[in-house]
Amino acid sequence: MAESSKTPYLLIAVLVLAVLGVYLPGLRNELLFDDMRLSDGTIFGQYGSLMDLRPRTLSYGSFVWLQKLLGDGWWKQRLFNVGLHLGVCAAVYALLKALLAHTRFPQDIEEQAHFTRSRDAALCIGVGLFALNPAAVYAVGYLVQRSIVMATLFAVLACWAFVRGLQTGRAAWHAGALACYALAVLSKEHAVMTAAMALPLYIYLRRPGWKTIAMVATAALLLVAVAAAVLHGIYGDVLGRVFDPRSAALAQQLEALRPGVAARMYPLSILNEAALFFAYGLLWVFPYVGWMSVDLRPPFPLGFASPWHLAGALGYLALLAGAAWMLLRRTGVLGLAALCLLFPLLWYWTEFATVWVQDPFVLYRSYLWAVALPGLLAIVLTGFHPRTLYIVGAVAGLVLGGMALERVASLRDDGTVWSDAAEKINRDAPPNAVGRSRPFLNLGAYHLERGALDQATREFIIADALGDLGGNARFNAGVALQQQKQHEAALQSFAAAQTKGFSGPLLHYHRAESEFALGRYEAAFNGFDTALREPGEDSESIRRMQLTLRQRHADAALATGRLDTAVSDFRALLKISPQNARVQVGLGIALASQGKTTEALAIFNPLIARSPSAPAFYGRAVAYHHAGRAPEALKDLDQAIRLEPGNAQYRAVREQFAASAGKP
């Protein structure tokens, strides 16, 4: 039975609808983790000009250009990611179709009446399952990871254009391949090895002699070298070393487990990543979502004799050598299978460029390496009846699509993404599985921000137990305990955080707040004073914190009798916020305590006329008391109590003033 001419269009429509069904429910997902580059000015403040070449100029710049074209709305940016994903699927289909057309299958398969339709159906199923694979969600649904999706699109197009150039003999195709390669590298540096694929593609399509192979290899390596040299100018301080403070801290944790590891981090990272090649492949071939999250933490090898890592690394080398040998010695489906294996094996080399200890196993990077899987699947399935293939493909697509939809839902917000990641962390893993604290730390921060203090404290304690770096977990646990008014426990947590290396104005501020709440005003004043004097980052949030610190410093100065300091602080605050009632009350009380009651009343009277609040009446009562006007003081205190009947301080002060005045 001949295939209908409408079948390809029907398959395209089904695939597009299936992909949209997976990703459209996530269009309103919030920005997550690395997505913060989109909101903190990193991307929109530095990208958007093709004349100013930066890392990922094209992919990051596309956010700026798309916003200028379509306006604000993260859903528009997400929809563009989905469009890129569909573009990748189309490019993969075009590349593999061109390669399959060149491939001779066993004679008994080629003699089948449905051979061509079976081959096309097998490829369609392979591309469709790639499109719906839940592992792809971490590239497509994670907004800022557009870089790897765009790099994959141009890398595959470069390979396809090169193949078409070899098949047609037209130089324009080769020029297009070179342009697409440049665009791929400008999208993300992980595509740099795409040029190396020219050699296996040429060997597969032309079966050249050794002299020609050497010439093509030289040209391909020269192109890779040029691109690598450009990237070295950008990433030179990253290559072969631990490149950020968090990674350095994790390396020190490993050093504590086995002295000498820190000096061997680079070769151990190569060993680790070579073994993880198979873990990535496993998650794409058997995409069980229970093994997936944004923060996976496999053990880092402490030596070169680690059995699992050694077996994985030897397996990677054996697979690379075997695929190269098979490509050179075999034609037909075995040669194509070898070629498909060489795609991820060669692209994966960028994993060996630096020390991956902070993010050793992240699924979005694997999107590029997975594009050859549809080719391998097409080889296996070709020969089966097309009807059977479409039925099996539909069932598999429904299963994968459902799992992918669940992964999209897991990326809805910080709460879902870090809850999911925390669930996937093995708390009983060996201690060299460093970095496991991060999901719990971030989940605790999410709960703390929303006032779920018990949950936040619990997550912070788990993070601390799993080796959190620098005392962050202990500090945040202290903040959660402080908000629950468990101030002694909070102070113990702050002390533990400081012991683990946490420092800065925030630590002194929060410790002083708990001291103040416990009535230890001298310690509180010293804490606020230290926080004010300690330099911090120059940001809007830090500047706002400085205002809060100055106000609390003034409060503590007033409580400890440092009246000149209190007055100075309150006056400085009033220059910034002249109508701040709380600051006016503080200044009035400080002036009254200095005996400047006339000046104090000149603050309180218009304040009460404008905004008759309980603190204002209380402050004026203090001024009246210092002025010896007991009846007015008691009257204002009564008014303050009526406005805030639950305030124990007002009642205690009234009893004190009444006793000193000899009145009930």
Functional labels for PLM-detected ranges:
Residues 2-483, 503-506, 510, 517:
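Polytopic membrane enzymes that build or remodel cell-surface glycoconjugates and lipids
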Residues 306, 419-664:
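C-terminal luminal/periplasmic domains and tails of membrane-associated envelope-modifying transferases
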